[in-house]
């Protein structure tokens, strides 16, 4: 299932970088359980259009989420919510 993008927007007057605002918004969807493990995120161009940000901004936000283990990217398939890491 492809996850639906939240209705929140980037605050263009905030001193917080756009990529960080986007990362926080996407992470909140995962933490709140609105996006479940295995759900496919919308494409990078869709995220760009929805939030009115550059592809570089989207890639930086997604790259950080991937580094944190929140999402996984599969070349040619898309970006998916990752399975939670076990703490054992």
Where are the regions that the model predicts?
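Residues in the helix-turn-helix
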Residues: 57
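Extreme N-terminal segment that seeds HTH/winged-HTH DNA-binding domains in transcriptional regulators
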Residues: 1-53, 63, 86
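Beta-hairpin "wing" of winged helix-turn-helix
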Residues: 34-39, 67-76, 80-83
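DNA-binding alpha-helical recognition surfaces that contact promoter or target DNA
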Residues: 60
């Amino acid at each position: 299932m492809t996850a639906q993008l939240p209705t929140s927007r980037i605050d263009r007057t905030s001193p917080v970088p756009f990529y960080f605002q986007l990362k926080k918004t996407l992470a909140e969807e995962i933490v709140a359980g609105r996006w479940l493990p295995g759900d496919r995120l919308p494409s990078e161009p869709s995220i760009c259009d929805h939030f009115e940000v550059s592809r570089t901004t989207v890639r930086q936000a997604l790259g950080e989420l991937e580094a944190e283990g929140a999402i996984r990217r599969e070349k040619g398939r898309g970006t998916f919510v990752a399975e939670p890491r076990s703490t054992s």
